[in-house]
Curated annotation (Swiss-Prot):
MRNA binds at residues 22, 177-180, 182, 205-207, 233. CDD domains: capping_2-OMTase_Poxviridae. It is found in: Virion. InterPro entries: mRNA_MeTrfase-like, Pox/kineto_cap_MeTfrase, Poxvir_cap_MeTfrase, SAM-dependent_MTases_sf. It holds the Pfam family PARP_regulatory. The lineage of its organism: Viruses, Varidnaviria, Bamfordvirae, Nucleocytoviricota, Pokkesviricetes. Residues 305-320 have a biased composition (Basic and acidic residues). GO terms for biological process: 7-methylguanosine mRNA capping; methylation; regulation of mRNA 3'-end processing. Interacts with poly(A) polymerase catalytic subunit OPG063. Interacts with OPG109 and OPG123; these interactions might help linking transcription to capping and polyadenylation. The active site is at 175 (for methyltransferase activity). Residues 323-333 have a biased composition (Basic residues). It comes from Monkeypox virus. This is Cap-specific mRNA (nucleoside-2'-O-)-methyltransferase.
Amino acid sequence: MDVVSLDKPFMYFEEIDNELDYEPESANEVAKKLPYQGQLKLLLGELFFLSKLQRHGILDGATVVYIGSAPGTHIRYLRDHFYNLGVIIKWMLIDGRHHDPILNGLRDVTLVTRFVDEEYLRSIKKQLHPSKIILISDVRSKRGGNEPSTADLLSNYALQNVMISILNPVASSLKWRCPFPDQWIKDFYIPHGNKMLQPFAPSYSAEMRLLSIYTGENMRLTRVTKSDAVNYEKKMYYLNKIVRNKVVINFDYPNQEYDYFHMYFMLRTVYCNKTFPTTKAKILFLQQSIFRFLNIPTTSTEKVSHEPIQRKISSKDSMSKNRNSKRSVRGNK
């Protein structure tokens, strides 16, 4: 792995400052994968999102409606974390598949085994009135093949728009991956929001989370065009191929790989009911508790040649620019 000095990770898509065309040989690479990596990705993103709402005074007293939540193993960690902080939240977890039994028997968690449609969304809104709703969506349709088709994605995004329109949440975190330009069908609309990047996503995933806080006005929509799709493809490939394969040498942490650096900046925003001498100590505590919960082994930085002594400095981003080749990014998890 190559080394780099960075002040901070790319937290949102708009911050990515370079692009790269796809190199076909990347499809043959053997991807590194942690146990329960998908649950880790979701847990970190949702902990960051909900902690942001907590900081803004939005979370306490809300009902989290999570559509597409199964198996939901990681949700037990989220529930326990905020419960132990004294934050009052109710959880409604909805999926056509069954949830992890670890979520059974909790008074503040309602499990619903069914898929949603417009009629059911209206019944949820009526049932929860006048509670404030926080919406999390991880809906995913695959009518064939290993990844959703563009038609699947457009159907999912239309459903997510209906969720927002009917449930009228105070905030939402939606699944978002732009269709690939070589599979383009038509322009479409998504809610306006911040496009949060995800540490520990699969190696060439182009998926992110669309985060929005609503302040009473009607939902704002953003049009997505084929030109946007080209931009998403190139920037996400640059992030995955170049940035995420770096070791951040000025990052004083047991594992200096970029995804851990990204995780560090997400976890530093999280509240704890303990005090710590340093931010690093808090984040080590949180990481260890998360990894222990998900049965993920703790690892150190690997394959760094001639590593200099760690130093707490900020330096310029030394990543190279303007690489070129051609093909679509593939990876949507």
